[in-house]
Amino acid sequence: MRHRHGLRKLNRTSSHRLAMLRNMSNSLIEHEVIKTTLPKAKELRKVVEPLITLGKKPSLANRRLAFNRLRDRDSVAKLFDVLGPRFANRPGGYLRILKFGFRVGDNAPMALVELLDRPEVEETENVQEAE
Protein backbone atom coordinates (compact mmCIF):
# COMPACT_ATOMS: atom_id res chain seq x y z
CA MET A 1 0.00 0.00 0.00
CA ARG A 2 1.17 3.51 -0.81
CA HIS A 3 -0.30 5.21 2.24
CA ARG A 4 1.38 8.49 3.19
CA HIS A 5 4.06 8.13 0.54
CA GLY A 6 5.70 11.51 0.00
CA LEU A 7 6.99 12.18 -3.49
CA ARG A 8 6.44 10.95 -7.02
CA LYS A 9 9.26 8.80 -8.35
CA LEU A 10 9.29 10.47 -11.79
CA ASN A 11 10.99 7.37 -13.27
CA ARG A 12 14.30 8.25 -11.62
CA THR A 13 16.57 6.87 -8.94
CA SER A 14 16.48 8.68 -5.61
CA SER A 15 19.84 10.39 -6.19
CA HIS A 16 18.83 11.53 -9.68
CA ARG A 17 15.48 12.80 -8.39
CA LEU A 18 17.17 14.70 -5.54
CA ALA A 19 19.70 16.29 -7.90
CA MET A 20 17.01 17.19 -10.44
CA LEU A 21 14.76 18.84 -7.85
CA ARG A 22 17.76 20.66 -6.34
CA ASN A 23 18.76 22.01 -9.78
CA MET A 24 15.18 23.01 -10.57
CA SER A 25 14.87 24.75 -7.19
CA ASN A 26 18.05 26.72 -7.83
CA SER A 27 16.84 27.70 -11.30
CA LEU A 28 13.46 28.80 -9.99
CA ILE A 29 15.01 30.89 -7.21
CA GLU A 30 17.47 32.47 -9.66
CA HIS A 31 15.12 33.20 -12.59
CA GLU A 32 11.77 33.25 -10.71
CA VAL A 33 10.02 31.47 -13.59
CA ILE A 34 10.81 28.15 -15.30
CA LYS A 35 9.12 25.87 -17.81
CA THR A 36 8.96 22.15 -17.03
CA THR A 37 6.61 19.18 -17.19
CA LEU A 38 3.49 19.24 -15.05
CA PRO A 39 4.41 16.35 -12.69
CA LYS A 40 7.87 17.86 -12.08
CA ALA A 41 6.24 21.23 -11.40
CA LYS A 42 3.92 19.71 -8.81
CA GLU A 43 6.86 18.05 -7.06
CA LEU A 44 8.92 21.22 -7.24
CA ARG A 45 6.21 23.04 -5.32
CA LYS A 46 6.65 20.60 -2.41
CA VAL A 47 10.38 21.40 -2.31
CA VAL A 48 10.47 25.17 -2.87
CA GLU A 49 7.60 26.37 -0.69
CA PRO A 50 9.16 25.09 2.58
CA LEU A 51 12.45 26.71 1.52
CA ILE A 52 10.76 30.09 1.10
CA THR A 53 9.16 29.63 4.51
CA LEU A 54 12.67 29.10 5.90
CA GLY A 55 13.76 32.29 4.15
CA LYS A 56 11.16 34.31 6.03
CA LYS A 57 13.00 33.71 9.33
CA PRO A 58 16.63 34.77 8.81
CA SER A 59 18.65 32.79 11.33
CA LEU A 60 21.94 30.99 10.97
CA ALA A 61 20.25 27.63 11.53
CA ASN A 62 17.73 28.31 8.75
CA ARG A 63 20.50 29.42 6.39
CA ARG A 64 22.34 26.17 7.05
CA LEU A 65 19.18 24.12 6.47
CA ALA A 66 18.55 25.94 3.19
CA PHE A 67 22.16 25.46 2.07
CA ASN A 68 21.92 21.77 2.94
CA ARG A 69 18.97 21.46 0.55
CA LEU A 70 20.12 23.83 -2.22
CA ARG A 71 23.94 23.60 -2.19
CA ASP A 72 24.26 27.01 -3.84
CA ARG A 73 25.35 30.12 -1.95
CA ASP A 74 23.83 32.57 -4.42
CA SER A 75 20.42 30.89 -4.20
CA VAL A 76 20.55 30.88 -0.40
CA ALA A 77 21.51 34.55 -0.36
CA LYS A 78 18.63 35.47 -2.68
CA LEU A 79 16.26 33.28 -0.67
CA PHE A 80 16.99 35.14 2.57
CA ASP A 81 17.72 38.65 1.25
CA VAL A 82 15.09 39.01 -1.50
CA LEU A 83 12.42 36.32 -1.36
CA GLY A 84 12.04 36.11 2.43
CA PRO A 85 11.17 39.80 2.85
CA ARG A 86 8.99 39.72 -0.29
CA PHE A 87 6.78 36.96 1.11
CA ALA A 88 6.93 38.06 4.77
CA ASN A 89 3.19 38.78 4.95
CA ARG A 90 2.04 35.80 2.86
CA PRO A 91 1.22 32.67 4.91
CA GLY A 92 1.98 30.23 2.07
CA GLY A 93 1.25 29.56 -1.58
CA TYR A 94 4.31 31.29 -2.97
CA LEU A 95 4.25 29.55 -6.38
CA ARG A 96 1.88 29.58 -9.33
CA ILE A 97 1.72 26.63 -11.72
CA LEU A 98 0.20 27.46 -15.10
CA LYS A 99 -0.51 24.73 -17.63
CA PHE A 100 1.40 25.51 -20.81
CA GLY A 101 0.19 23.08 -23.45
CA PHE A 102 2.00 19.95 -24.58
CA ARG A 103 5.60 19.31 -25.62
CA VAL A 104 6.07 18.72 -29.35
CA GLY A 105 8.25 15.61 -29.18
CA ASP A 106 6.40 13.37 -26.74
CA ASN A 107 3.16 15.27 -26.01
CA ALA A 108 4.07 15.63 -22.32
CA PRO A 109 1.96 18.21 -20.45
CA MET A 110 4.07 21.29 -19.81
CA ALA A 111 3.74 23.94 -17.10
CA LEU A 112 5.15 27.32 -16.16
CA VAL A 113 6.21 27.59 -12.53
CA GLU A 114 6.58 31.14 -11.28
CA LEU A 115 6.98 32.92 -8.00
CA LEU A 116 4.14 35.24 -7.07
CA ASP A 117 4.63 38.99 -6.61
CA ARG A 118 7.45 39.15 -9.14
CA PRO A 119 8.60 42.68 -9.91
CA GLU A 120 7.45 43.81 -13.32
CA VAL A 121 10.17 44.07 -15.96
CA GLU A 122 10.02 47.38 -17.74
CA GLU A 123 9.87 47.28 -21.53
CA THR A 124 11.70 50.61 -22.01
CA GLU A 125 14.80 49.02 -23.56
CA ASN A 126 12.76 47.23 -26.23
CA VAL A 127 10.77 50.37 -27.00
CA GLN A 128 13.94 52.42 -27.47
CA GLU A 129 15.45 49.80 -29.78
CA ALA A 130 12.29 49.74 -31.91
CA GLU A 131 12.40 53.52 -32.46
From Swiss-Prot:
PANTHER family per record: LARGE RIBOSOMAL SUBUNIT PROTEIN BL17M, RIBOSOMAL PROTEIN L17
Keyword match DNA-binding: no
Q: Which UniProt keywords apply?
A: Ribonucleoprotein, Ribosomal protein
One GO BP annotation of this record:
translation
Q: Which InterPro entries match?
A: Ribosomal_bL17, Ribosomal_bL17_CS, Ribosomal_bL17_sf
Q: How does it assemble?
A: Part of the 50S ribosomal subunit. Contacts protein L32.
* Superkingdom, natural source: Bacteria
GO CC annotations on file: cytosolic large ribosomal subunit
Q: What protein does this entry describe? A: Large ribosomal subunit protein bL17
Q: Which HAMAP family match?
A: Ribosomal_bL17
Stored PROSITE patterns = RIBOSOMAL_L17
* Cited Pfam families: Ribosomal_L17
The Swiss-Prot or TrEMBL record describes its family as follows:
Belongs to the bacterial ribosomal protein bL17 family.
Q: Name one GO molecular function term.
A: structural constituent of ribosome
